[in-house]
């Protein structure tokens, strides 16, 4: 059922805006829209977005230290009251500040350690040099250079000495072997030219009053201090991470505050107002909620205008509501539509899904495995429930067709598809005819409700009669009746099919309509042969898995070792094969069943085009807000 909507305009004093919007968010009764002329948002929006981002960063950082063991069994979200959720907490904000400071400090320490280690590594080749860096400089009579010579040229060092230089050789580093070359000023050009020919690369050491070993020791101590501080900061972060639940609550609080500040409103000097939608049956409850905050407010409600499209909210029973996800993936119903397609579509989807699976064993697996998954993970998503409920349909059709994990453990109630393919095809096409007829019947109902009775009779009913008559021609007992129905319906279509056209189209339009009916419905009916195809493919693969498992199973001639290996191999092939086949069949049934609903069924009457009803409500990820009817006293 599509829930009727009312257009709401709420007027109140400017000073009451924040408490009123909090009350609307608390009750979740009104969807506020951004269509008001001159609308604006709360000035604190950017600030609240920044706060949410900060909490998110702190939560992410704390998560790296939290000692939380993830269980495959998901726990239910903690339930909190809205007022508790929105209560300010100075302590939690201080925790966020401290965590972000620790994160920044750890990042700085990490960069400092990298820099220190790079400096220490650069000094390592010079540790054996017992000269302070500030003493390495030119004099009036000599020139000195420090640098590296590639290790492969070290045997040619005498060439530098022959040119008049003195070479001090130290340890090897990444660039090469560390050397210090001293030469008399008169011979320096020749000496350094000889060094360059050996690949000498000059390095300017820092002018500090330390030897390389002394500076290296200082850097090592500095790195140890930073590492110690880092360990202390990480320990503190681990302690603070024990407050991760408080941080999660704070994140939900800030997210809810952001959503509140995103609300569009307009205002004058003294009054503010918002526009939106609410359920028609919740207007009184909305008015009571507003009066809890202030008596100086006015709630104006009215039916939607012809040029307005309200949001869509569907309300169906527990089972049918799960299949709304299938419709929504096609297009959400338009609230101005006469009918909600979900009830009829959901029943057909359930029936056809079970036929496509067509195996009682697989249906039982769907019920047990998906039911267990729902229980353990607390996942109550619509797609999960569709598979769970379709398991019962699969069991039913599996019993009808006598298929149990690809074997005929019990006689089929109707027939075995593999033994009588043509009859099974006829059943599948028959299901298709009924499915299509139900879509045409929905269109008939819409035409009657919207004041087009002749369209319902001359277009929709005539199509049903024509197809029914043509199908009767295949029965000897009903052939004569089928001829009469076919002739009458063809005549009606030809004579009335062009009634909306002008000129010659009134006479030729009927023939075109007749062709479209025969070709369109004929092609649509043949589309249901895919039910048989999926049924057979799943059954054959299941049989193959059974045969493969049976081939490796031990027999009377198997030894002890062969018996153990054969039994384990057979069981593995059986389990893995059937699980793989089940998953593949589920995917195929989901896709092809959806296709039949979208094209063959919805194509007869449904267009959609709606958008979801999303009332202002708390935006939470980690906790669940308790639903309390605060408006009621």
PLM regions: where:
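Conserved, carboxylate-rich catalytic/transport cores that coordinate ions
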Residues: 1-6, 18-21, 25-32, 264, ...
């Amino acid at each position: 059922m599509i829930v009727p909507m009312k257009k709401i305009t709420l007027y109140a004093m400017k000073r009451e805006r924040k408490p009123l919007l909090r009350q609307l968010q608390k009750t979740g009764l009104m969807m506020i829209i951004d269509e008001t002329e001159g609308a604006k948002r709360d000035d604190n929006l950017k600030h609240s977005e920044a706060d949410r981002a900060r909490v998110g960063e702190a939560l992410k950082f704390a998560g790296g230290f939290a000692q939380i063991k993830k269980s495959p069994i998901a726990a239910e979200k903690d339930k909190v009251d809205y007022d508790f959720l929105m209560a300010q907490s100075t302590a939690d904000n201080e925790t966020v500040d401290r965590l972000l400071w620790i994160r920044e400090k750890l990042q700085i320490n990490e960069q400092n350690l990298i820099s220190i280690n790079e400096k220490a590594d650069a000094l390592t080749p010079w540790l054996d040099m017992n000269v302070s860096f500030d003493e390495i400089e030119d004099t009036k009579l000599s020139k000195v250079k420090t640098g590296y010579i590639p290790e492969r040229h070290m045997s040619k060092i005498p060439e530098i000495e022959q040119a008049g230089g003195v070479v001090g050789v130290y340890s090897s580093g990444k660039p090469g072997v560390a050397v210090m070359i001293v030469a008399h000023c008169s011979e320096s050009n020749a000496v350094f030219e000889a060094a360059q020919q050996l690949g000498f690369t000059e390095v300017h050491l820092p002018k500090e009053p330390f030897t390389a070993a002394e500076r290296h020791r200082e850097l090592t101590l500095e790195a140890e201090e930073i590492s110690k501080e880092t360990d202390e900061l990480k320990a503190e972060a681990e302690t603070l991470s024990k407050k991760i639940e408080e941080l999660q609550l704070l994140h939900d609080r800030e997210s809810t505050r952001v959503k509140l500040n995103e609300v569009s409103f307009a205002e004058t000097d003294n009054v503010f107002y918002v526009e939106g939608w609410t359920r028609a049956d919740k207007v009184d409850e909305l008015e009571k909620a507003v009066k809890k905050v202030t008596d100086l407010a006015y709630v104006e409600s009215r039916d939607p205008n012809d040029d307005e499209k309200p949001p869509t909210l569907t309300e169906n029973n527990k089972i049918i509501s799960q299949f709304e996800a299938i419709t929504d993936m096609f297009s959400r119903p338009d609230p101005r539509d006469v009918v909600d397609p979900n009830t009829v579509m959901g029943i057909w989807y359930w029936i056809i899904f079970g036929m496509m699976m067509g195996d009682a064993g697989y249906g039982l697996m769907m019920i047990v495995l998906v039911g267990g998954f729902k229980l353990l993970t607390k996942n109550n998503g619509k797609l999960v429930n569709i598979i769970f409920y379709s398991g019962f349909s699969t069991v039913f059709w599996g019993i009808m067709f006598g298929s149990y994990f690809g074997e005929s453990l019990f006689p089929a109630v109707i027939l075995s598809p593999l033994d009588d393919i043509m009859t099974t095809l006829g059943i599948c096409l028959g299901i298709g005819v009924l499915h299509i007829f139900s879509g045409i019947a929905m269109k008939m109902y819409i035409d009657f409700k919207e004041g087009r009775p002749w369209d319902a009779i001359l277009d929709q009913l005539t199509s049903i009669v024509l197809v029914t008559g043509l199908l009767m021609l295949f029965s000897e007992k009903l052939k004569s009746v089928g001829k009469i129905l076919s002739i009458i319906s063809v005549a009606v279509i030809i004579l009335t099919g062009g009634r909306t056209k002008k000129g010659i189209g009134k006479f030729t339009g009927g023939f075109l309509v007749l062709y479209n009916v025969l070709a369109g419905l004929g092609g649509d009916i043949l589309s249901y042969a895919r039910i048989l195809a999926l049924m057979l493919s799943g059954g054959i693969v299941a049989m193959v898995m059974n045969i493969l498992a049976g081939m490796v199973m031990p027999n009377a001639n198997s030894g002890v070792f062969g018996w153990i290996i054969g039994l384990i191999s057979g069981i593995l092939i059986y389990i893995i094969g059937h699980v793989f086949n089940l998953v593949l069949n589920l995917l195929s049934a989901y896709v092809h069943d959806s296709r039949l609903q979208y094209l063959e069924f919805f194509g007869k009457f449904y267009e959609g085009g709606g958008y979801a009803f999303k009332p202002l409500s708390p935006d939470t990820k980690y906790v669940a807000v308790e639903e309390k009817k605060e408006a009621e006293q």
